[in-house]
């Protein structure tokens, strides 16, 4: 299936609530976050029912476990809402690739450079691949000149992350990152 929205994983009860709590005594915190102290589980459940809320085990590993009186449904909703907000704020950085040849003509060079600029302005990383074919391997200096030209043309927009020192296989790879954050 293509497209569509990614389903956000629903948080399944990470905390024990009400009668699921197994400890005899708990360290209780009320709705406002005030420490009530160490009380029996029975009295903590009674206080939670009195206010019409749930008793939620916050820290099960401490001795005695820390429990808080709260509306558990609202707590889960707020937690999932904050996770959604964090995902919205994240920018996925893609790596775009543009391929050059040592003898790329001026018109093609300008078109590819324009695409490089567009990718960098969108905040993506760009992988510039310079490919050698046949006897072009003899003229590696031309390839380095092309990469240096790209580097100098994009000096205001991009930072060079990786610059090739030698040919790897039949290609040279340079990786550029956008300067603006």
Swiss-Prot record:
UniProt keyword terms in alphabetical order: Cytoplasm, Initiation factor, Protein biosynthesis
Single GO MF annotation: translation initiation factor activity
Domain of life, source organism: Bacteria
PROSITE patterns: IF3
Location in or out of the cell: Cytoplasm
Keyword check for Hydrolase: no
Any one Gene Ontology cellular component term annotated for this protein: membrane
Assigned protein family: Belongs to the IF-3 family.
Function: IF-3 binds to the 30S ribosomal subunit and shifts the equilibrium between 70S ribosomes and their 50S and 30S subunits in favor of the free subunits, thus enhancing the availability of 30S subunits on which protein synthesis initiation begins.
Subunit structure: Monomer.
The protein's name: Translation initiation factor IF-3
Organism (species): Buchnera aphidicola subsp. Baizongia pistaciae (strain Bp)
Gene responsible for this protein: infC
């Amino acid at each position: 299936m293509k497209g569509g929205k990614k389903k956000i994983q629903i948080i399944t009860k990470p905390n024990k609530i009400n009668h699921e709590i197994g400890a005899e005594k708990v360290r209780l915190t009320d709705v406002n976050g005030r420490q009530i102290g160490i009380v029996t589980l029975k009295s903590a459940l009674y206080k939670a029912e009195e206010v019409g809320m749930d008793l939620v085990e916050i820290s099960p590993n401490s001795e005695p476990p820390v429990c808080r009186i709260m509306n558990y449904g609202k707590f889960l909703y707020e937690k999932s809402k904050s996770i959604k907000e964090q995902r919205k704020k994240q920018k996925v950085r893609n790596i775009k690739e543009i391929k050059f040849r040592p003898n790329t003509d001026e018109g093609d060079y300008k078109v590819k450079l324009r695409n490089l600029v567009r990718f960098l302005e969108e905040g993506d990383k760009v992988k510039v691949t310079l490919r050698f074919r046949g006897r072009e391997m003899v003229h590696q200096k031309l390839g380095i000149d092309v990469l240096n030209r790209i580097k100098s043309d994009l000096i205001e927009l991009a930072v060079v992350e990786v610059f090739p020192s030698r040919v790897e296989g039949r290609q040279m790879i340079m990786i550029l990152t956008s300067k603006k954050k």
